[in-house]
Amino acid sequence: MRHKAGLLFFIVLAAAAVIICSGGLGGQQKYISYSVLGGFSKMSQKSFSKVLFHPDLQQKPMIALTFDDGPKAGVTDWLLDELEKRNVKVTFFLIGSQADLPENRETIRRMAEDGHQIGCHTYHHVQMTTLSENQQKQEILQWYQAVSSIIGDFSYAVRPPYGCVNNAVCRSLNVPVILWSVDTEDWTGKSAGEIADYVISEAKDGDIILLHDIFEESVQGAVMALDDLMRRGYTFVTVNDLLADRDIAIQSGKVYRQAAQGGK
């Protein structure tokens, strides 16, 4: 069946009249227009190359697991071990005060070395909408100083604690804001099995899933769900990679909750 599908794919491509319609000056996206059986459509050259040379990858559903409030000694380290075994990358939204704890420095260094994405969850885990603009900026600056002292300079996105964000916060922070499309509510005392079952039942292609790596049950449930969904054909990636795969530009001051097909 797979060989037949691949053959059909290339027959369709052979029938397509492909025309490069815009060169994309100054770093703009390059697009390809194509005609298949009389109909016209358009996709980026990046996406077209993916379909042409990696048709199986284009079909694969993707999910981004995200973990807030850490790191926590022992718990986050166990999670990193399990992710390494599976060659899975996730996104960690760290609290700056946690990063300043000596016992967490090596864990954060390992996150970066293992290829995980590191984002900001403020220094004190405060509700950003209650702060002045100067206080908001100080929270982010103090966080960045704590984390960059461990892993060096890097670009980052912010996840405001409690998901509380408004236009004023977005303008003040001037970085991408990452929220979520699936909330596991793992902080309510759920068991690992309950967390896993919820993720498995609710997760779909393009979702950004909210978890916390300060609870043993949460990281255990995440790994259980990970194994189940990988068997079903899902790939797990960082938030940045999820958005990039869908050709969704990551822009400062913009809020992202998921990455649906086509960037919707």
Language model regions located:
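N-terminal pre-catalytic segment of deacetylase/amide-hydrolase enzymes
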Residues: M1-L65, P71-N87, P102-E106, L226-D228, ...
